[in-house]
Design a protein with these regions (language model features):
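Active-site phosphate-binding/coordination module
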Residues: 58-154
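Structural recognition of alpha->loop->beta junctions
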Residues: 96-112, 182, 262-277
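Mg2+-dependent phosphoryl-transfer enzymes with acidic/Ser/Thr/Gly-rich catalytic loops
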Residues: 11-20, 34, 60, 208-288
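Non-catalytic pre-domain segments flanking phosphatase-related domains
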Residues: 1-43, 47-52, 62-65, 69, ...
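Conserved Rossmann-like nucleotide-cofactor binding loop
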Residues: 46, 85, 231
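A structural signal for isolated positions on well-ordered beta-strands in alpha/beta enzyme cores
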Residues: 38, 76-78, 104, 224, ...
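Active-site flanking residues adjacent to catalytic metal/cofactor-binding acidic residues
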Residues: 41, 107, 227-228
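Conserved acidic, metal-coordinating active-site core of Asp-based
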Residues: 147-238, 247
């Protein structure tokens, strides 16, 4: 497990030391050649605190300034999220920010792409199974006796079922896993578990695929990825793959008490979005 950063918000604090050799090599590569480094970050739980209503999620107040200070000093910064790209841009407040002129947001696990240069979103047609599940899901949840407080989030190219508002969120979550997996399979989709949420989406869409393609497009010589949830595990696997190909990488976990799997895989663990902000600020200061 990675070590935690301190509680100080002083951007001149020394960088924390990753707990693994591979992580230390990844950080050293970033610092040695920042102009060849790609930094990828999740949105919810990483740049934005987790809230009960995803529509109310917003980037940490200091996240965008920290990104804007760091982005001009590295090859590229990409936000990789399960949200629609345009929604992440709005909730993050990323558009029109000095320092983020070349930011990329890969939405729907890379199926959508927003570039700050153009300010537009590009995307292929949606999978037909998503529309079928969207129509069937309300009645399906009623028939299987889903817990009261379970609710559906429309995500455009995916549909998510949340249990955070249920009386027992974890029990409601576990009760839905098998039925939703069956529903997803019937329509050619898969289920991605998260923090009290199960997302039904097309196969072949994950943060690992998105990160690999973006790193290769950028010709990066090192990669850092920051995430908080089970949906970030494919991105962690992608960094492992890049490491095996000779590209140094650093895995950072935005730690929480809800999800421990990422912390166990990470080179470095920070204290939620606030800790992510501190890390970004410190990196920017180190690269001055």
């Amino acid at each position: 497990m990675g070590i935690h950063t301190t509680d100080s918000t002083n951007p001149t604090d020394p960088l924390p030391t990753p707990a693994t050799r591979a992580g230390r090599e990844g950080l050293e590569a970033l610092l040695a050649r920042p102009g060849a480094a790609v930094i990828g970050l999740d949105f919810d739980g990483t740049l934005a605190p987790i809230v009960a209503d995803p529509e109310q999620a917003r980037a940490h107040p200091e996240a965008v300034p920290a990104l804007a200070a760091l982005a001009p000093k590295v090859a590229s910064v990409a936000v990789i999220t399960g949200r629609p790209a345009g929604v992440a841009v709005r909730h993050g407040g990323f558009a029109g920010v000095s320092g983020l002129e070349h930011l990329v947001v890969l939405g729907h696990y890379g199926a959508e792409r927003w570039d700050a240069v153009s300010g537009t979103v590009s995307a292929p047609p949606s999978h037909p199974g998503v529309a079928a599940v969207r129509a069937e899901l309300p009645g399906f949840l009623d028939r299987i006796g889903a817990w009261r407080g379970t609710w559906i989030e429309e995500k455009g190219r995916a549909v998510a079922v949340h249990t955070r508002r249920a009386e027992d969120p974890q029990a409601a979550f576990e009760a839905l896993r098998a039925p939703l997996a069956e529903l997803a399979t019937r329509h050619g989709l898969i289920v991605e578990p998260g923090r009290m949420v199960l997302e039904l989406r097309p196969p072949g869409m994950d943060k690992g695929v998105a990160l690999l393609e973006y790193v290769r497009e950028a010709g990066a010589e090192s990669v850092t990825y920051v995430g908080d949830d089970l949906g970030d595990l494919p991105a962690y696997a992608a960094v492992d793959k890049l490491r095996s190909d000779g590209v140094p990488g650093l895995l950072v976990c935005s730690g929480s008490s809800e999800v421990t799997e990422l912390a166990e895989r990470a080179d470095l663990v920070v204290d939620g979005p606030e800790g992510v902000v501190r890390l970004l600020r410190t990196l920017a200061a180190q690269l001055d």
